[in-house]
Amino acid sequence: MPQTQTKEFLSNHPLFRTDDLDEARHCVTQKFCDHKLFLSSKGDQLSVHHNHVAGKYVSVNYLHYGANVQINPGMLERFYLLQIPLSGHALVRHRGKDIVANRKTATLLNPDRETDMIWHKNIIFL
């Protein structure tokens, strides 16, 4: 069965596009929290798309790195993070447990727990 292309949600609300790792980390930090960001695979090329709509108490984000990346935000501190995979998969370590996030399994991250994630290049989160 062929894999379907995932629509880019919130495409009318682009926040940024970049191929630069440091710029991606800086821009994502502005909307979420400080974090470490590394390419997981040599030779991978970033192609970050981040769309964002802000409400009074909640924001909705579409985020795709286009490469295998490791993200380590530590503790989120001031917000919960619901990650809903639209395609692909990621490994999320939270509360001492490993969770494979995919189209059947979303993750809800607590602000007071350490988090470490590996997003595979095909993962797209809403």
Language model features with spans:
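A short, N-terminal "cap"/entry segment at the start of jelly-roll beta-barrel domains
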Residues: M1-K56
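N-terminal regulatory/effector-sensing and dimerization cores
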Residues: Q45-L126
